[in-house]
Regions:
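A general structural signal for well-ordered alpha-helical segments in protein cores
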Residues: 21-24, 49, 53, 75, ...
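Anionic-ligand binding region
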Residues: 52-56, 61-93
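Predominant activation on well-ordered alpha-helical scaffold segments within soluble catalytic domains
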Residues: 2, 24-32, 53, 57, ...
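Conserved C-terminal alpha-helix-loop-beta "cap" of PLP-dependent enzymes
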Residues: 78-133
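Conserved core segment of the aminotransferase class I/II
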Residues: 1-42
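PLP-dependent enzyme catalytic core of the Aspartate aminotransferase-like
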Residues: 113-165
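General beta-strand structural signal in soluble alpha/beta enzymes
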Residues: 1-3, 65-67, 101-103
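Structural signature of PLP-dependent enzymes
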Residues: 31-54, 64-74, 165
Length: 165
């Protein structure tokens, strides 16, 4: 294979340019910060995740948890199907209340189709179509979780009240 880029004298056979030293140092610092207290961050997220799952399933009827509970679930992941609700409508309803969620994976966000993953694990079309994915981060606090638990039943209730099903 012939080279298409040449480097400076003395390095031309090794690489076609200079290292991005600020980028390398920045990546090192970003990595260090991301992994700092990783286990504590994961423990905290699991607590918030479990609180959301438990409260939503108890307080909002006709809901289904997608995926396992406990340690077999990612610490930042809450995916729930709201029956008689359209997932995309729920994302809009929640965004009007300052809560930002997703109704599907990022790679299919422009398609109004249910998640192929949820269909593959046995969810019915209607169940998968009413799913919402909530992602948690270390930036979220207890007040954020409480706020979601306050506005989510309102949003689901409003959509169900106008649903033809």
């Amino acid at each position: 294979i012939d080279r298409i880029l040449e480097g400076p004298l003395g390095t031309e056979s090794l690489w076609p340019g200079l290292e991005n030293v600020p980028g390398i140092v920045g990546f090192q610092m970003a990595s260090r910060l991301a992994f700092e207290n990783l286990h504590e961050k994961a423990r905290r997220l699991k607590g918030f995740r479990d609180m959301l799952i438990t409260e939503i399933l108890e307080k909002i009827p006709e809901t289904i948890l997608n995926g396992p509970r406990g340690d077999r679930r990612a610490p930042d992941n809450v995916n729930i199907s709201f029956l008689r609700c359209e997932g995309e409508a729920l994302t809009i309803e929640l965004s009007l209340r300052g809560v930002y969620v997703s109704s599907g994976s990022a790679c299919t966000r422009r398609l109004l189709q249910p998640s192929h993953v949820l269909l593959a694990i046995g969810r019915k079309y209607e169940e998968a179509h009413g799913s919402v994915l909530m992602k948690l981060s270390s930036k979220h606090g207890f007040e954020d979780i409480q706020y979601v638990l306050k506005v989510l039943p309102q949003a689901v209730g409003r959509l169900r009240s106008i649903s033809p099903f």
